Curated annotation (Swiss-Prot):
Record text on subunit structure and interactions: Homodimer or homotetramer.
GO biological process, one term: cellular response to hydrogen peroxide
Catalysed reaction, written as an equation: H2O2 + AH2 = A + 2 H2O; 2 H2O2 = O2 + 2 H2O
Name of the encoding gene: katG
Protein name per its UniProtKB record: Catalase-peroxidase
Organism encoding this protein: Rhodococcus erythropolis (strain PR4 / NBRC 100887)
The enzyme's E.C. designation: 1.11.1.21
InterPro entries, sorted: Catalase_peroxidase, Haem_peroxidase, Haem_peroxidase_sf, Peroxidases_AS, Peroxidases_heam-ligand_BS
């Protein structure tokens, strides 16, 4: 067998794409514009994302506890029902080879595979595949049928299992029903009830690729090569059938989902061990996607006018590929066939580029999905050949030819990671099949020591305030530790005290030199307390407690007596428990709460403030009170005076709002400092304050100004302190899944 490159580089492709999507026209946005405030004033911060997933859209009620309901679930019975579904073929969408396994593997993969590591968005953790745009992406064609097949199971178990869990559990069950041993599974995903507003790219047509610049540089944080795809175009970049060029796209997009080369190769080879793609006829005979389909189709899309439209006549992608002779069984035949032939280009019945063995080799060795008397020729996608023709992937996959047990192990681990990457630490996982924590789950030690009680907390607060650290230092350090959290994939946060480890201790926003000195003092307090015997305090708890004590002291300085809630139980992670590369993506490009903006950032700071607030699960009132309070506490990056509109810093006052709304101050862009504004006395012109756009937006944006007016009022001093304390505690506890 020759290893020469079998690629034709001069072909043109039809407008088909990913392994399961039809080449149908994109939906055209219509409407009478301008029709919203955003249309009139597109540069205003969009605060609507901070109102998303309101309880008003959730039918389950405020008291619904998914974990409690799940505890009532017979998971073994659920598993039996899902596995039974695999071979219960339905006439309205017949199962290929009498088994829906390949379809459900694809459904689960595409539910989880939208995850992107750059901002943690996407993934299967909320059941978003049920809603637009994901339910109508060309890459998700025919997955509406998979979800409808699952409906009787969901209907039977009701609120005891979420759609989010079921959509990914089905793929796990599919693998096991086809003889594969999975690595494990964790439930615990809670459903959303409205679409997620996520930036999926700049294009306004399906399969557009305006996201590239220069030498095929993919814009961040996007994780797919074209609009409406999960990863890559299986025909090759922009439909050009070049496996080597496709490998570059594969490597980039899978890396943006936190997968390395071994994991990537395992997922592609493992996933394509099962099932088939569908391109029995011309793609222009396929109707509109679910969101564009007529009401009588009841949310089902892509209705085909080719033959019966289903079974042997099904069109989903325009590609007609069956990879192995055993498409409902786990084995090593995908790799055996990939390396067993030399390959040449051909086209599917729909006109899509795909590959067959040269010189008619292998003809009749692949079974037909609906006619047991017929045989087919082996077929591959351009992106399958990438696993052989890319030198790195070739080294990995060729070894698996002789070591199938290694392939199975790597696929099991990669599949588990794919399904769970956006779920956060294992403390969020439910069910009996959760394996030991993996490094990518950011593990922390269990809390085995006796926890500090109220008396210990009082002693530690006193020692922290007497340690020589200022209110500002204690607040800033606690905020830096906790505010690394992002709600999109439940990573970061104060638990683990990773602020003292690589890479966080060297992030610019954390002011490494100052941070190091503060941590040394906190470690001294910790050591002195722990050496006394009895309860032990972790550095993670002490960092948060320092901020808590400082907030209480600052409120006292303002004449307000408040108690800031504190719950011990955090533990300290080690450097060995911390994947440095994985944590690098958590470094903030901006943190408006600390008035930090990374050099060279092009997106306005006030827009990035909203994104940071979204990551911290904050509402507009919480954002407002936190910014105002942190300015009063002098918690700015670099201790700049921007936005510190007070002559009594480190005192928890509402001075930020009072002075921001004072019409005696006139604001002008600074002539000496970028992204800074000078506030001068309107009557005399004397300088009064400096500010950033993050500060001034609380006076310029009408919604934020309305909130600022509440806190600037004469009767708001106590409310301001109490609201700040509540919002502060919320941020400190965002990653306390053990108690929340």
């Amino acid at each position: 067998m020759s290893d020469s490159c079998p690629v034709a580089h001069d072909g043109n492709t039809a407008s088909t794409s990913e392994s399961e999507n039809p080449a149908i026209p994109s939906p055209t946005p219509t409407g009478n514009r301008p029709r919203t405030n955003r249309d009139w004033w597109p540069n205003q911060p969009d605060l609507s994302v901070l109102h998303a997933h309101s309880s008003k859209s959730n039918p389950m009620g405020a008291d619904f506890d998914y974990a409690q309901e799940f505890a009532k679930l017979d998971v073994e019975a659920l598993k039996r029902d899902v596995i039974a579904l695999m071979t219960a073929s339905q006439d309205w969408w017949p199962a290929d080879y009498g088994h829906y396994g390949g379809l459900f593997v694809r459904m689960s993969w595409h539910a989880a595979g939208t995850y992107r590591i750059a901002d943690g968005r996407g993934g299967g953790g909320q059941g978003a595949q049920r809603f637009a745009p994901l339910n109508s992406w060309p890459d998700n064609a025919s997955l509406d049928k998979a979800r409808r097949l699952l409906w009787p199971v969901k209907q039977k178990y009701g609120k005891q299992v979420s759609w989010a869990d079921l959509l990914v559990f089905a793929g796990n069950c599919a693998l096991e029903s086809m003889g594969f041993t999975t690595f494990g599974f964790g439930f615990g995903r809670e459903d959303i009830w409205e679409p997620e507003e996520i930036y999926w790219g700049p294009e306004d047509t399906w399969l557009g690729d305006e996201r590239y610049s220069g030498d095929r540089e993919l814009s961040g944080p996007l994780g797919a090569v074209q609009m409406g795809l999960i990863y890559v175009n299986p025909e090759g970049p922009n439909g050009q059938p070049d496996p080597v060029a496709a490998a570059r796209d594969i490597r980039e997009t899978f890396a943006r989902m936190a997968m390395n080369d071994v994991e990537t190769a395992a997922l592609i080879a493992g996933g394509h061990t099962f099932g088939k793609t569908h391109g029995a006829g011309p793609a222009d005979l396929v109707g509109p996607e679910p969101e564009g389909a007529p009401v009588e189709q009841q949310g089902l899309g892509w209705k085909s006018a080719f033959g019966t439209g289903v079974g042997k006549d099904a069109i989903t992608s325009g590609l007609e590929v069956v990879w192995t002779p055993t498409p409902t069984k786990w084995d090593n035949t995908f790799l055996e066939i990939l390396y067993g032939y030399d390959w040449e280009l051909t086209k599917s019945p729909a006109g899509a580029w795909q590959w067959i063995p040269k010189d008619g080799a292998g003809a009749g060795t692949i079974p037909d999905p609906f006619d047991s008397s017929a045989g087919r020729t082996p077929t591959m996608l351009t992106t399958d050949l990438s696993l052989r023709l890319d030198p790195t992937y070739e080294k990995i996959t060729r070894r698996w030819l002789d070591h199938p047990e290694e392939f199975a192990e790597e696929f099991a681990k990669a599949w588990y990671k794919l399904l769970h990457r956006d779920m956060g630490p294992v403390t969020r996982y439910l069910g009996p099949w959760v394996p030991e924590p993996q490094l990518w789950q950011d593990p922390v030690p269990s809390a085995d020591d006796q926890l500090i009680g109220d008396a210990d907390i009082a002693i530690l607060k006193s020692r922290l305030l007497d340690s020589g650290l200022s209110v500002s230092q204690l607040v800033s350090t606690a905020w830096a530790s906790a505010a690394s959290f992002r709600s999109t994939d439940m990573r970061g946060g104060a638990n683990g005290a990773r602020i003292r480890l690589e890479p966080q201790k060297n992030w610019e926003v954390n002011e490494p030199a100052t941070l190091s000195a503060v941590l040394q003092t906190l470690e001294r307090v910790q050591q002195e307390f722990n050496q006394a015997g009895g309860a032990k305090v972790s550095l993670a708890d002490l960092i948060v407690l320092g901020g808590t004590a400082a907030v209480e002291q600052a409120a006292k300085n303002a004449g307000q007596d408040i108690t800031v809630s504190f719950t011990p139980g955090r533990t300290d992670a080690t450097q060995e428990q911390t994947d440095v590369d994985s944590f690098e993506v958590l470094e903030p490009r901006a943190d408006g709460f600390r008035n930090y903006l990374k050099g060279g950032e092009k997106i306005p700071a006030e827009i990035l403030l909203v994104d940071r607030a979204y990551m911290l699960s904050l509402t507009p009132p919480e954002v407002t009170v936190l910014v105002g309070g942190l300015r009063a506490l002098n918690a700015n990056f670099g201790k700049t005076g921007h936005g510190v509109f007070t002559d009594r810093p480190e005192t928890l006052t509402n001075d930020f709002f009072v002075n921001l709304l004072d019409m005696g101050t006139e604001w002008k862009p600074s002539k000496t400092e970028e992204n800074v504004y000078d506030g001068v006395d309107r009557a005399t012109g004397d300088p009064k304050y400096t500010a950033t756009a993050v500060d001034l937006v609380f006076g310029s944006n009408s919604q934020l100004r309305a909130l600022s007016e509440v806190y600037a009022s004469e009767d708001a001093k106590q409310k301001f302190a109490e609201d700040f304390a509540a919002a502060w505690t919320k941020v400190m506890d965002l990653d306390r899944f053990d108690v929340n």
